[in-house]
A protein has these predicted regions:
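Glycine-rich phosphate/pyrophosphate-binding loop regions near the starts of catalytic domains
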Residues: 1-115
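Low-complexity, flexible helical/coil segments
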Residues: 22-29, 66-71, 100-104, 122-125, ...
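Glycine-/charge-enriched secondary-structure boundary and capping motifs
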Residues: 46-61, 77-82, 131-142, 146-261
Length: 261
């Protein structure tokens, strides 16, 4: 879609965001990032836009871009196709690593707003939305992944957070259970946060069931935090200092898995 809409800078931010947000779920601070860009015939404009995005993503995350690899491989890639990859190294104090073991029933789930689709679910987007509609709304559909590093690391210094999940591929149903303690499940309350219209476009255009939407997309929640009920408003207030919108969207219950109702 980025190629079709000729919007490349956001891809670099997406690449960094997917890495640093994953590291953040452990309570770790990203230190440095490296990228890999491979293409059949080097396109200077495209490469510059992508690298600008990677640099911007690293700036937002507060980590260093220390190097990377640019490979021109004619004959291996179709005209215009390219590969983009990267990895990040972070650090955390061993005794402060967030592993979900302190999660227990009665705690609440705070959801932090996403910027939109982020980086997952685009196979379905391409399937259900018309190309002309995508191009018309490209800025909204291709809005880069939100990077949560600075607000969440600041929060961890102030408030108790027992688990963090980055809502990526697999949506709520796959990402939340793996950060919960044994014997704990999550109950998510639909309607407890505003769902961006881009998800309504997808659901209505493709006649997609609600459960499938929550299994595929972030539905407006890019990251969830588990904390004590009595601290939830403090958590939300602290995040608001970084202009992050957040809501109590559910609670931890006895059992397993995730229910969205």
């Amino acid at each position: 879609l980025a190629m079709y809409c000729e919007r490349y800078e956001g891809l670099g931010i997406d690449l960094v965001g997917m890495n640093v947000n994953d590291i953040l779920t452990l309570g770790a601070e990203p230190l440095f990032f490296l990228d890999y860009f491979a293409i059949g015939k080097l396109d200077h404009h495209r490469m510059v836009e992508i690298i600008k995005g990677i640099s911007e993503g690293c700036k937002q995350a507060g980590c260093a871009l220390i190097g990377g690899e640019t490979a021109e491989m004619p004959g291996l890639y179709a005209n215009g196709d390219f590969d983009l990859a990267g990895f990040c190294v972070g650090i955390a104090d061993r005794d402060k690593i967030i592993d979900g073991k302190k999660v227990k029933p009665g705690q609440v789930i705070v959801g932090i707003a996403s910027s939109g689709i982020h980086s997952n679910g685009f196979s379905l987007v391409r399937k259900v939305l018309r190309p002309d509609f995508i191009k018309q709304h490209a800025e909204e559909i291709l809005k880069p992944t939100k990077i949560y590093v600075k607000p969440v690391l600041s929060l961890l210094e102030k408030e108790p957070v027992y688990s963090i999940a980055h809502i990526t591929g697999g949506g709520f149903f796959d990402n939340i259970p793996r950060v919960l303690a044994d014997g704990c499940g999550a109950k998510i309350h639909m309607g407890s946060w505003p769902i961006p219209r881009v998800f309504r476009w997808i659901q209505e255009s493709g006649n997609v069931q609600a459960k499938e939407m929550y299994r595929t997309f972030n539905m407006g929640i890019g990251m969830i935090l588990v904390t004590e009920k009595k601290r939830a408003l403090k958590v939300i207030s602290h995040l608001s200092k970084f202009k992050e919108r957040a809501w109590v969207i559910g609670e931890i219950v006895k059992g397993e898995g995730v229910s969205v109702q």
